[in-house]
């Protein structure tokens, strides 16, 4: 069984914001794999299905970004999901819009959703797909930037990165994450 988590904030006011690109990737996977995100439990919304013979759970924590671990850990405990069968997708300011970086482990890098996940799992050793949102320009505050929407010029690159993140998740169901990293980080 595999768990794929997208980080974001709940509520219509946060839909399609930079900080919610992880949620957008989960929506793409749900559509692609015909998985309904209709279960509400563990402080999140999730759905399960079978993809290429593998049971997959897709989760969007509804705790707000900074408390994401409060949703992830109880679901992992309930379904007895090992950390190596878990991947998290989230926004990253240090990567250009439209680009991905896959990592096997690492620090939170200033991302509070990842910090919460590390805190609740008790380890930094989990797989992640970092989705580029770039840094704010013209002196804009980071908080205003990440809670802002993508520009119309960015949308094609954003859609491309969501597709690539979904492709990476699909390949991960049948291949080691390290192999997927070599493909998608090049």
Curated annotation (Swiss-Prot):
Residues reported in the UniProt entry to bind tRNA: 14, 64, 66, 112
Pfam families listed in its UniProt record: Pept_tRNA_hydro (PF01195)
Active site, renumbered: 19 (proton acceptor)
Biological processes per GO annotation: protein quality control for misfolded or incompletely synthesized proteins; rescue of stalled ribosome
GO cellular component, one term: cytoplasm
Keywords associated with the record: Cytoplasm, Hydrolase, RNA-binding, tRNA-binding
Top-level division of the source organism's lineage: Bacteria
Chief location bin: cytoplasm
Record-linked InterPro entries: Pept_tRNA_hydro, Pept_tRNA_hydro_CS, Pept_tRNA_hydro_sf
Localization terms from the record: Cytoplasm
A molecular function GO annotation: tRNA binding
Residue(s) at site: Discriminates between blocked and unblocked aminoacyl-tRNA: 9
Similarity comment text for this entry: Belongs to the PTH family.
NCBIfam families per UniProt: pth
Complex formation: Monomer.
Function noted in UniProt: Hydrolyzes ribosome-free peptidyl-tRNAs (with 1 or more amino acids incorporated), which drop off the ribosome during protein synthesis, or as a result of ribosome stalling. Catalyzes the release of premature peptidyl moieties from peptidyl-tRNA molecules trapped in stalled 50S ribosomal subunits, and thus maintains levels of free tRNAs and 50S ribosomes.
Full protein name: Peptidyl-tRNA hydrolase
């Amino acid at each position: 069984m595999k768990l794929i988590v997208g980080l974001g904030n709940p509520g219509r006011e946060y839909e399609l914001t930079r900080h919610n690109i992880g949620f957008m990737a989960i929506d793409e996977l749900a559509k692609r794999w015909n998985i309904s995100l209709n279960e509400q439990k563990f402080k999140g919304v999730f759905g399960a299905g079978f993809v290429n013979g593998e049971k997959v759970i897709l989760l969007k924590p509804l705790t707000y970004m900074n408390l994401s671990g409060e949703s992830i850990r109880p679901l992992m405990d309930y379904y007895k999901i090992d950390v190596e069968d878990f991947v998290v997708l989230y926004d990253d300011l240090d990567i250009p819009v439209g680009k991905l970086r896959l990592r096997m482990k690492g620090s939170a890098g200033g991302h509070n959703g990842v910090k919460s996940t590390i805190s609740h799992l008790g380890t930094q050793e989990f797989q992640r797909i970092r989705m580029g949102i770039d840094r704010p320009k013209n002196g804009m505050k980071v908080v205003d930037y990440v809670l802002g929407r993508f520009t119309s010029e960015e949308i094609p690159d954003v859609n491309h990165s969501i597709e690539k993140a979904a492709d990476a998740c699909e390949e991960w169901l049948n291949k080691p994450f390290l192999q997927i990293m070599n493909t998608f980080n090049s």
